[in-house]
UniProtKB/Swiss-Prot annotation:
Transmembrane segments: none annotated. GO terms for biological process: Arp2/3 complex-mediated actin nucleation; cell migration; regulation of actin filament polymerization. Keywords: Actin-binding, Cytoplasm, Cytoskeleton, Phosphoprotein. May be a component of the Arp2/3 complex in which it may replace ARPC5. GO terms for molecular function: actin filament binding. The lineage of its organism: Eukaryota, Metazoa, Chordata, Craniata, Vertebrata. May function as component of the Arp2/3 complex which is involved in regulation of actin polymerization and together with an activating nucleation-promoting factor (NPF) mediates the formation of branched actin networks. This is Actin-related protein 2/3 complex subunit 5-like protein. Gene3D superfamilies: Actin-related protein 2/3 complex subunit 5. One of its GO terms (cellular component) is cytoplasm. The modification Phosphoserine is found at S64. It comes from Rattus norvegicus. InterPro entries: ARPC5, ARPC5_sf. The gene is Arpc5l. Belongs to the ARPC5 family.
Length: 153
């Protein structure tokens, strides 16, 4: 009995290894290794410089990080989409919204409402124009689907 209590095997465990401040989620590591979800900022910036707003709009909405829990990826995607939305001319907004299907309009509405949460200079006026056109095409159902959706952008 005395022999078991004097054992020092328990001292070989490095308790700093189990520090909760050093926690790393395996899913985030796998996502970072396989390429993060979200729009490609280089592709979107290139299309914006070329003046191809419609393709930049579709590229920004492609691969949206809805299923990820990484908030930094979601913020980066929100910034890219907001940059594209603010670069559109007022006369081109309706054509861009009409080029989307129902799921695309719902995704656009999610980004619009996310933009309303954290307004930047002049973004609210632009987002209101986008909201008006998206509401005309998607109807009230798109607002309800966005507000009741569990997966956010």
């Amino acid at each position: 009995m005395a022999r078991n209590t004097l054992s020092s095997r328990f001292r070989r465990v490095d308790i700093d290894e189990f520090d909760e401040n050093k926690f790393v989620d395996e899913h985030e590591e796998a996502a970072a290794a396989s390429g993060e979800p979200g729009p490609d900022p280089c592709e979107v910036d290139g299309l914006l410089r070329q003046g191809d707003m419609l393709r930049a709009f579709h590229a920004a909405l492609r691969n949206s990080p809805i299923n990820t829990k990484n908030q930094a990826v979601k913020e980066r995607a929100q910034g890219i989409v907001l940059k594209v939305l603010t670069n559109f001319k007022s006369s081109e907004i309706e054509q861009a919204v009409q080029s989307l299907d129902r799921n695309g309009i719902d995704l656009l509405m999610k980004y619009i409402y996310k933009g309303f949460e954290k307004p930047t200079e002049n973004s609210s006026a632009v987002l209101l124009q986008w909201h008006e056109k998206a509401l005309a095409v998607g109807g009230l159902g798109s607002i309800i689907r966005v507000l009741t959706a569990r997966k956010t952008v």
